[in-house]
Amino acid sequence: FAAELDESDGTIVKYAPNVCVINNLEPDHLDFYKDGLKSILETFEKFISNIPESSVVLVNKDCKATMSLHSHKTLTFGMEDADYTARNVRFMSDCTTFDVYYKNEFLTDLTIILRGKHNVYNALSVLASLHQAGVDVNLVKPHFATFSGMGRRFQKVAEFDGVTVYDDYAHHPTEIKATLSSAEGMNDKRVIAVFQPHRYTRLKNLWNEFLGAFQGVDKVVVTDVYAASEDE
């Protein structure tokens, strides 16, 4: 089975998967990780050290932090010079297509109906995981073209009077940038972002990053902070 592991409270170290994907690491959950990225990397190093030597760890080649992790068997995925590489990426109005190479050998081509560069990384890492698990990639390829995404991940929730409304749970500056990039090129209309900050600690510690996350947006509306049990 497949599962998404949550690193927010450090309990990720309790798990020992056969195939593990670490997409990217940045300062977050700073209410728990008091030393920021340093603490996060220490937790992930402990997590990796606990998994069996036969396990495969797939890390994002384009993320400096993930590339600093050490494992018994590490493979990389990314846009260039990785074990699994996405090449010839084409963003179109209704889909995204790209070719997948494994160790510079053509493996397959993929079509996804999700937008944004981050979803290329997501799909690439999923395919790499399946390939490492011994699954025939040509058998699973058609399913990538029909997966419409998760709820609250650039989810279309309404359309009226020429306005299209999308809902996304992004609450980290990098996530916000990725979400807003999904709207680029969709049409020539204005992009209005309504943002509710999540946790006072995150807003305080990543303030400068938040200021730069909305560049290119026509209008930003900021609501009250969702405290998530924190005191103001």
Q: Across the structure, where does each feature detected by a protein language model lie?
A:
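Switch II (G3) loop of P-loop NTPases
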Residues: 1-8, 165-171
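Short beta-strand segments
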Residues: 2-4, 23, 60, 194-196
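Short, flexible loop segments at the rims of nucleotide/cofactor-binding pockets, characterized by
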Residues: 3, 32-38, 169-170, 197-202
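Switch II of P-loop NTPase G domains
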Residues: 8-16, 173-183
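A short, aliphatic-rich alpha-helical micro-motif
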Residues: 14, 48, 214-215
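Acidic, Mg2+-coordinating active-site environments of NTP-dependent enzymes
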Residues: 17-165, 188-189
